[in-house]
């Protein structure tokens, strides 16, 4: 199973738990963290069964361009691969548009969630879209792992769905402002360089200090600010930190001032 790296922390272990071997493919930071199509082509063997795609991306904030989206779909068709598309942040797009693999359900499994679109992160309720053949197989596994989400949560989501559009209409511009503020402040920190994320709720800057990301994240945490070490998202994530702008502008400003002070003291 080909998985993006830097990528969400669960892709590798989920592949292993399914009895597969995860193989990482890179994202081109200089192009807004677009998947490296040439590398993906080189990594495919007769044992490759699936390609995991995440757009908008956690942790990078990258959003697939139409060109890359079409190239991935063509690769899947040519090599008879399943695409597993994580589209949890599809409603949080600030630049460009979201391209969904719902266009290719004959060989795609699209995974989504209400965690972000309805701000119900802790409820752990989502959904998937694919073809009937895949649904039949997934249903078997699903029954023996969790059966179903709690009924009260299902009712709460059902009641909330009609107002989801209005909620997102109000929330997304707020997150866009937070995104711009965070990236601007990160790029003002000596040695930091942050690509502007086009979607999701994270910034993923690089830093020039010769300190492992896990150690640097711990130092920053000891001063009261939480960020995620890049290494948590795979070896290709080392040298980065992930910051979330799902916080007030005041907290973003105060938190990044702390980060700046920490960096300047090292």
Where are these regions (language model features)?
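Conserved glycine-rich beta-strand-loop-beta hairpin in the small C-terminal domain of fold type I
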Residues: 158, 174-183, 194-207, 237
